[in-house]
Amino acid sequence: MLRFLISIILAATVGPAFADDMAGGSRVEVNGMKVYYEVSGGGDPLIVLHGAYMNIPSMGGIIPALAERHRVYALEFQGHGRTTDIDRPITYENLGDDVAVFMDAVGLEKADVFGYSMGANAGLQLAIRHPEKVGRLIVASAAYDIEGLQPAFRAFIPQLTVEMMLAMPFAEEYKQLAADPNGFPALVEKLIALEHEPLAWEADVKALETPVLVITGDADVATLEHSVAMFRLLGGGDMGDMGQPLPASRLAVMPATSHTAVITQTDMLISFIEPFLAGETPKGMFAQ
């Protein structure tokens, strides 16, 4: 979400958005693209999915932090970073399918998944369309329905233009990593079109059996009410301490946190993610 604002301030809030290929980077054929990815750490597999206009370096400290306990597979989406673009719209369904094909290509039968923003919605679609491939899913700054986005952002979407983005320093910096240095305008067109895609996944989310950790900032692009509604669709929101086990899915709200600040708070993210992946539940007076 919030592609435009991310593109303006990403370098300042996250760290170096562009760098040379890191050691261990590889490419694999996925649906006609050469997808760039990096593998780090050891343990159970965990796939990391970045947001729009982002790439592996611009995800900041979360990837190395997750790699302390997991075998992390971080990939770059269609037209992003070092991954090539193809003549195809960028949709959440397409991105989710790309991840499924990527998993087959690198020999991953099943993995846990962490996605941020666009990557979170792609992760939702992966779990919806390919549930057998996802163990546990963490979605940071996700939305399952267009009505759940903040009114101010929904009003801003019609104002987005390619020209607006081409005037940003980000447009020039894009060339430092891009598989096609001249491909930025085409990428922007596709991402603006993505903002206009209708989101209406309530029934699909409710049908999910995959455990999901919903993470949101308290000033995120989706309303707090929407994030709570997602948690309820996943079986959460009832009172504990009543003799019934807590649901497998969880909700975490990051205080004083805007959309673009979510991914910068590595320590807080890890404090939510690791207990969820380990299946650890705090114990109260009445055991759940």
Residue ranges and their predicted role:
Residues 33-84:
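Conserved HGGG/HGGXW glycine-rich cap/lid loop of the alpha/beta-hydrolase fold
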Residues 208, 214-216:
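Short beta-strand/loop motif that positions the catalytic acidic residue
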Residues 188-204:
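Active-site nucleophile elbow and catalytic-triad environment of alpha/beta-hydrolase enzymes
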Residues 40, 74-114:
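Active-site loop/oxyanion-hole signature of alpha/beta-hydrolase fold enzymes
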Residues 52, 111, 115-120:
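Conserved alpha/beta-hydrolase "nucleophile elbow" surrounding the catalytic nucleophile
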Residues 64, 218-257, 265:
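Conserved loop-alpha-helix segment in the C-terminal half of the alpha/beta-hydrolase fold
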Residues 247-288:
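Catalytic active-site module of serine/aspartate enzymes centered on a nucleophile-bearing elbow/loop
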Residues 121-129, 135-171:
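Flexible "cap/lid" loop of the alpha/beta hydrolase fold
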